[in-house]
Amino acid sequence: MVVKIGSSTVVGADGKVNRAFIGGLADQAAALRKLGWRLVVVSSGAIACGYPVLGFDRKPVGDLPSLQACASAGQCIISSAYDEEFHARDLLTSLVLLTRHDTARRTSYLHARDALLRLVELGVVPVVNENDTVTVDEIKFGDNDTLAALVSCLVSADLCVTLSDIDGLYTANPHEDPTAEFVPVVHKIDAKIIASAGDSSTSVGTGGMITKIRASRILMTAGIQSVICSGEEPDALVRLARGESVGTLFDPPAERLDIAPRKLWIALGDKAHGSVTVDDGAAKALVSHGSSLLAVGIREVDGQFAEGDVLDVCDPRGMVVARGIAEADSDVLELAAGRRQDQIASNRLLADLAEKPAIHRDNLIVFA
């Protein structure tokens, strides 16, 4: 089981670590072990508990060196809290700090996987966070919801649980709409589900419900169940392990249970360097038939990217339906966009795309 803990859950508004919460989490980890479960923790909070001890009265947004300094100081504080509380329950923790750079290359992605699996095998509870001390925008995961999805795929988790200040998904923002209804189970994440997420980011964190939904979509694609629930829910992890219903469950379809590891790396390892928008016919061919993406189906190209870079594939309504590795650079695909097959074949600059796909099906993962 992977559990992701948001900044506002593990760190109070005063910047102090919530030791009572971490102690309760350690109690649950000990109980889970007796039930045969192993736990990996993805914990935010380094910057949130670092800025007060460095003399800032608020998070220094926009000041990258100061944010990195806060992360460095805060990571020591929060790691010590985990170590002390878990050690008191005879559990050993370890610290794993990752950046997008560590997973963008498949070799280092696999090394990260092997290290995490070995730690779990040895009975250790890994505490994972993004290495905010060295990250810049180009190599950031951006939020720990995405990082938790990555870690869940790395260790082939049975369940990923997000403990937050939100008790689950609603049809609208319950703080603004009194008619909002709680959603106990989600079987498919569509545009309606994404629209209902809105924006619920907090003052101490970087995520919101929309980032949690996107992470859950990746997990559903990987065939991994995920849950969003409140960090104040008593014994949530133990109850989930026993099969109880807590929060909102994102339940993947059975046919998604055997995704090739390399395709999961495409979905998670590197960020998208650009995107292509395809017509409805191409989107249907990808989603329903597992086809390669042909250049003739591309309508728009966004961003600058090279052959071999990872791209998002969007349908005409802007929904990301797939991600894959480009067989041509952005200049070539932009030249091909909107052209008929005969026009592509007759253009000497596009001749290769008449013979090969823009993204081959073996290098393409379709999202659930």
Task: Tell where the protein language model's regions lie, with residue ranges.
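C-terminal catalytic "cap/lid" subdomain
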Residues: 1-368
